[in-house]
Amino acid sequence: GLGDIGPLASKPVMEGKGVLFKKFAGVDVFDIEIDEKDPAKLVDIIASLEPTFGAINLEDIKAPDCFYVERELRKRMKIPVFHDDQHGTAITVGAAMINALKVAGKDPKTVKLVTSGAGAAALACLGLLLKLGIPRENIYVTDLAGVVYEGRTELMDEDKQFFAQNTPARTLGEIIEDADVFLGLSAGGVLKKDMVRKMAARPIIFALANPNPEILPEDVKSVRDDAI
């Protein structure tokens, strides 16, 4: 997205989410923007609000801090804690993936999935896609340092290590060959037309980077009329 733009600049986004809660679920919400970067202090602040609210929806906390914040709040609080960037994105991607695989006539157990991005949203999506039947050995993760492979040390953490693969490929351009699915949760323009050409028949492309997608739909269709 736009990166760390501060709590004041995020307020219109939070207010917009509040409108969606009210319109589609009839839930009244309060948007609360907190000017705090220390994860432990953030947990203390949010936990202290429990007597006032019935649930907490976390928004726009960077990885890996978001995993710690959510985990600690769930331990301490007796009300539901939901991280929108992780679980909201994962639910949407999971539903879309089920339908896309049906349309493409592909089996989740045999597809090759390549993801660009290894932040909170991407890792949450992959966690749900595992439960929907895509095997871990068929999932290839890329980030700013390239392919997440066994033995890599740069920009690695425990969550990425789970998806490390034994592969000689080091770049998105290499690993995308014969991929059935591209899941983009990274940055605009990273998926090139030449990469789309190298994907398997009836490729499924989720270009979800915000505000600019990894590739535009018209660019995909210009090189692959069988793409979904």
What are these regions (language model features)?
Residues 71, 189-228:
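Rossmann-fold NAD(P)-binding glycine/threonine-rich loop
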